[in-house]
């Protein structure tokens, strides 16, 4: 009997060893953060009591200052919000760190685009500046090419009411101020003006400020200075087109060389025969002749059939014969203009 009972007890013990105990599954807790309107300690106790009665809530933590409620448990956040809303309190999910990270990523993606646009705009500005600097260098080089000799510049101003330089075609108007440089041999002429300049076919125009003519010569060239330009302007206003009492003695566009022992006029200068030059004159002057024993002279010529200009380019050839003495003789003119232009020299030029 004893043996049988012992065998049974051993088998039972072995069965108990092979039986595995069933352990419960671990709870999956999650943390939810809610924003709840909490005004006082009474609201805090009421919300904590409501949340503790919900199945699956393990712990609750309430921060009154931030109105922040932290719930740890195995429950969905929608259930928590519904329970709190039924109690008459507003509740919503607190923005989590994941959402903040997503927003930060979006902002980070927007910033590089703006930075790229700014950098591209800066590069365009740099390229434009480089192009402008390059153009200035080229222009400076072009200006340096003409500096073979020192230039002596002389400025003469005349009013646009006078006739303009000759030309073929209809009159032209300049809308903007422009500068023109014309190099004639060793002489450089610069014309500035804002009014209407035109060819010989148009009437004189009174639009715009006075025009300025700058012409230069080599440093060793002698320039004779005459009365200031404003005196010439005053004289031309008083006597725009006087009458002519004598026929011309030479062609209007031809000028004589310097006479023996006499100084050349201010608008005239000589050049070597191998390199003829061009000069600028503003009027056509004729010497006096005898008409019936009365010696008369006209300082200006009447406008011919084709319009002429007080501003013209003259060709000078030293091979021509010298003019007669009457060309350099004293010319009678109105007392007012003579007194304003003489300055002790009866043969002084009215322009230079």
UniProtKB/Swiss-Prot annotation:
A lipid is attached at residue 349 (S-farnesyl cysteine). Residues 172-183 have a biased composition (Basic residues). Residues 97-107 have a biased composition (Polar residues). The modification Cysteine methyl ester is found at residue 349. A metal cation binds at residues 40, 43. Residues 350-352 form a propeptide. It holds the Pfam family HMA. GO terms for molecular function: metal ion binding. Residues 133-148, 192-203 have a biased composition (Gly residues). Residues 96-150, 162-211, 229-252 are annotated as: Disordered. PANTHER family: F15K9.8-RELATED (PTHR45868:SF80), HEAVY METAL-ASSOCIATED ISOPRENYLATED PLANT PROTEIN 33-RELATED (PTHR45868). Belongs to the HIPP family. This is Heavy metal-associated isoprenylated plant protein 36. It comes from Arabidopsis thaliana. The lineage of its organism: Eukaryota, Viridiplantae, Streptophyta, Embryophyta, Tracheophyta.
């Amino acid at each position: 009997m004893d043996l049988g009972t012992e065998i049974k007890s051993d088998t039972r013990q072995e069965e108990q060893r092979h039986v595995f105990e069933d352990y419960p599954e671990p709870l999956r807790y999650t943390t939810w953060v809610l924003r709840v309107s909490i005004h006082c300690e009474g609201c805090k106790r009421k919300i904590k009591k409501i949340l503790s009665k919900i199945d699956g809530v393990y712990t609750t933590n309430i921060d009154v200052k931030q109105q922040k409620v932290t719930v740890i448990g195995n429950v969905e956040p929608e259930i928590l919000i519904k329970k709190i809303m039924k109690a008459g309190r507003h509740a919503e999910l607190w923005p989590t760190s994941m959402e903040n990270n997503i927003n930060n990523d979006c902002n980070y993606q927007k910033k590089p685009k703006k930075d790229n646009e700014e950098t591209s705009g800066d590069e365009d500005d740099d390229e434009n500046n480089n192009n402008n600097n390059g153009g200035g260098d080229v222009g400076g080089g072009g200006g340096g090419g003409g500096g073979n000799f020192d230039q002596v510049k002389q400025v003469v101003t005349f009013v646009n009411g006078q006739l303009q330089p000759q030309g073929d075609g209809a009159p032209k108007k300049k809308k903007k101020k422009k500068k023109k440089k014309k190099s004639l041999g060793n002489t450089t002429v610069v014309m500035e003006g804002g009014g209407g300049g035109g060819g010989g076919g148009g009437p004189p125009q009174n639009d715009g400020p006075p025009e300025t003519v700058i012409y230069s010569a080599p440093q060793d060239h002698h320039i004779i200075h005459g009365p200031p330009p404003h005196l010439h302007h005053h004289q031309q206003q008083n006597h725009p087109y006087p009458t002519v009492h004598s026929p011309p003695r030479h062609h209007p566009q031809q000028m004589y060389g310097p006479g023996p022992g006499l100084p050349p006029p201010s608008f005239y200068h000589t050049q070597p025969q191998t390199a003829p030059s061009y000069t600028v004159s503003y009027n056509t002057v004729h010497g006096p002749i005898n008409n019936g024993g009365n010696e008369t002279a006209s300082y200006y010529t009447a406008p011919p059939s084709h319009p002429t200009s007080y501003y013209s380019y003259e060709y000078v050839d030293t091979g021509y014969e010298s003019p007669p003495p009457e060309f350099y003789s004293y010319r009678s003119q109105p007392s007012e203009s003579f007194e304003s232009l003489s300055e002790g020299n009866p043969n002084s030029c009215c322009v230079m």
